Design a protein with these regions (language model features):
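Charged, low-complexity intrinsically disordered terminal segments
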Residues: 2-38, 120-350
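Short, hydrophobic transmembrane alpha-helix segments
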Residues: 31-43, 63-66
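Short alpha-helical transmembrane interface motifs in multi-pass membrane proteins
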Residues: 42, 55-58, 135
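Membrane-targeting alpha-helical segments
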Residues: 44-48
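Transmembrane alpha-helices and immediately adjacent membrane-cytoplasm interface residues
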Residues: 50-122
Length: 350
């Protein structure tokens, strides 16, 4: 390697986005340390103020509505370490961006609640034939917001390799739309093979949307990757890009792994879009994870889950009814399975 190549490599390391983000975060940490040192000069007065503030905060927290475990998790550190606990609580509570995101998600959930209702016939069956399962189904619908379905079958994949082969076959069958939502995406064999299929499907007129978590910008994908995807005709966005700001909002990540194809087929599980998940790349020895494929009525919940998260950062409201498949599954013999299915999910704010 000559000197010029070495300089270019050093320049790239110094000015790549992840390096700059880390440096800016370090600057903010140093600033806080300087502030703490300044406070030490007036420690007694400052400690007294924080002790009084902590006492007020404890009274406030105890009297607010909410989960008792959440309250205890704050009350203990505030009482044990008044300076740190009180300031940390104020810092977390003042995270406006987190509150705005939570409010946006709650608004979308209220809007889409009408699409997530258990069929009355299924409710009647459960009430009469399986009271225990009926209680569980009622709990999921009332508190989690997800209904119970029939006419659905599932296939289990014991490895990422098995899932990838089935996923490619199903993607090739797409006629209307393909939705993908993942936590980790990395260029390589797995993502490369899927991307080639998506490119072909775009040319065939299939709508393709792709959403991934912003942590991928550190080392896995360039910050401009959504722009590249959009140039291919794939609607793409990052959820919560990493920014050089000290904030609890950075911890709200989208860990979901969802694929929806034409509203009748879905994939989920623990497999991300990176080569270590199919053992083409070794990180921590042989990678063992699982996934499932769902076909039938229950895919409706996966479709809505994806659109809800996509809608979080959109200014306009999504037309959900356009993507909720209205195919009658009752007469589809290959979907006749005994039992019921309740797909459910969380969100980055949970």
């Amino acid at each position: 390697m000559n000197k010029n190549e070495g300089r270019k490599g050093l320049f790239h390391i110094m000015f790549e986005r992840s390096t700059l983000v880390i440096l800016l975060l370090l600057v903010q940490i140093i600033f806080f340390i300087v502030c703490i040192n300044w406070i030490n000069e007036y420690f007694i007065k400052f400690y007294t103020i924080c002790y009084i503030l902590g006492s007020i905060l404890v009274i406030y927290i105890v009297n607010t509505k909410g989960n008792p475990m959440y309250k205890i998790a704050w009350v203990i550190p505030i009482l044990v370490i008044p300076v740190f606990g009180a300031l940390l609580y104020i810092f977390v509570r003042l995270q406006l961006e987190t509150k705005l995101m939570s409010a946006r998600i709650e608004k979308i959930r209220r809007k889409t609640k009408k699409y997530l209702k258990t069929d009355e016939m299924i409710k009647h069956e459960l009430e009469n034939n399986n009271p225990a399962l009926n209680n569980l189904a009622n709990y999921f619908e009332e508190f989690a917001g997800y209904p119970t379905y029939k006419n659905t079958k599932a296939k289990y994949f014991p490895s990422g390799e098995a899932k990838l082969e089935e996923l490619k076959l199903e993607l090739e069958k797409a006629k209307k739309f393909i939705f993908l939502e993942y936590f980790i995406v990395a260029e390589g064999k797995m993502w490369g093979e899927i991307l080639e299929i998506l490119k072909r499907k775009v040319k065939e007129g299939v709508e393709v949307r792709f959403m991934y978590d912003g942590t991928c910008t550190f080392k896995l994908l360039p910050f401009s990757y959504p722009k590249y995807m959009n140039s291919l005709g794939i609607k793409c966005k990052m959820f919560s890009p990493i920014r050089p700001v000290l904030s609890t909002y950075q911890n709200n990540r989208d860990h979901r792994k969802i694929v929806v194809i034409d509203g009748h087929t879905a994939f989920t599980g623990g497999i991300n879009l990176a080569d270590e998940y199919i053992n083409e790349k070794e990180l921590f020895g042989h990678w063992k994870d699982t996934a499932i494929m769902v076909k039938g009525e229950a895919v409706k919940s996966f479709t809505i889950m994806f659109l809800q998260m996509w809608d979080v950062t959109e200014k306009s409201e999504e037309d959900y009814e356009k993507y909720i498949n209205d195919i009658e599954y009752e007469n589809d013999l290959h979907l006749k399975e005994e039992g019921y299915m309740i797909p459910f999910g969380d969100c980055p704010m949970d």
